[in-house]
């Protein structure tokens, strides 16, 4: 099972139907990847994601989505080992996904599809990053994007 929390930071909350769409996207992706755990999705404005992108990635501009995985140790962090017998007592916190709502609107218009489809795409994209997928090489990109499309097709978010 996947537990999802949706937060709004420095923006008006999106409506309940869109929030349910994000949950459906994440549940479909989790099912495809056979993973359980907890995910927090925070919806922000361009100024906030710009700040996070600059502070955490060293890129001084807004972006569409950022992912902060909890299951991969960062540089200089100590790895935590949990006894298998005790593992069920701890939730599998997969991480945080930060999405710029204004950027999603812009990109939906640029790509000629719905805002819902763009928001779903960014949600699944961020989720796959939490699981370690990347698109730094053509092979990685092909694998990641095919998984994204499979999830989006499954829930009816086609182009």
Swiss-Prot record:
GO BP field: rRNA processing
Annotated localization: Cytoplasm
Chief location bin: cytoplasm
Record's GO cellular component terms: cytoplasm
Positions annotated to bind Zn(2+): 125, 129, 135
Transmembrane segments: none
Keyword Membrane (UniProt): no
Entry EC number(s): 3.1.-.-
Swiss-Prot/TrEMBL keywords: Cytoplasm, Endonuclease, Hydrolase, Metal-binding, Nuclease, Ribosome biogenesis, rRNA processing, Zinc
Keyword Nucleotide-binding carried by entry: no
Cofactor(s) the protein requires to work: Zn(2+)
InterPro entries referenced in this protein's UniProt entry, alphabetically: MetalPrtase_cat_dom_sf_prd, YbeY, YbeY_CS
Signal sequence coordinates: none
One GO MF term attached to the UniProt entry: RNA endonuclease activity
Details of cofactor binding: Binds 1 zinc ion.
Pfam name, any one: YbeY
EC main group: hydrolase
Domain of life: Bacteria
Free-text function comment from the UniProt entry: Single strand-specific metallo-endoribonuclease involved in late-stage 70S ribosome quality control and in maturation of the 3' terminus of the 16S rRNA.
Family in the record: Belongs to the endoribonuclease YbeY family.
Alphabetized NCBIfam families for the sequence: rRNA maturation RNase YbeY
Name listed for the protein in its UniProt record: Endoribonuclease YbeY
Species assigned in the record: Brevibacillus brevis (strain 47 / JCM 6285 / NBRC 100599)
């Amino acid at each position: 099972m996947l537990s999802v929390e949706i937060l709004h930071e420095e923006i008006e909350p999106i409506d309940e139907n869109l929030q349910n769409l994000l949950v459906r996207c994440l549940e479909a992706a989790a099912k495809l990847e056979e993973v359980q755990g907890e995910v927090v999705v925070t919806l922000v404005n361009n100024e906030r994601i710009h700040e996070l992108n600059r502070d955490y990635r060293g890129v001084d501009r807004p972006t569409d989505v950022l992912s902060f995985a909890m299951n991969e140790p960062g540089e200089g962090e100590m790895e935590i080992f949990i006894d298998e017998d005790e593992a069920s007592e701890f939730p599998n916190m997969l991480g945080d996904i930060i999405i710029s709502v204004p950027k999603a609107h812009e990109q939906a218009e640029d790509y000629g599809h719905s805002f819902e489809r763009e928001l779903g795409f960014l949600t699944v994209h961020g989720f796959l990053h939490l699981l370690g997928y990347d698109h730094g090489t053509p092979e990685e990109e092909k694998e990641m994007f095919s998984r994204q499309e499979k999830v989006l097709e499954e829930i009816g978010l086609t182009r």
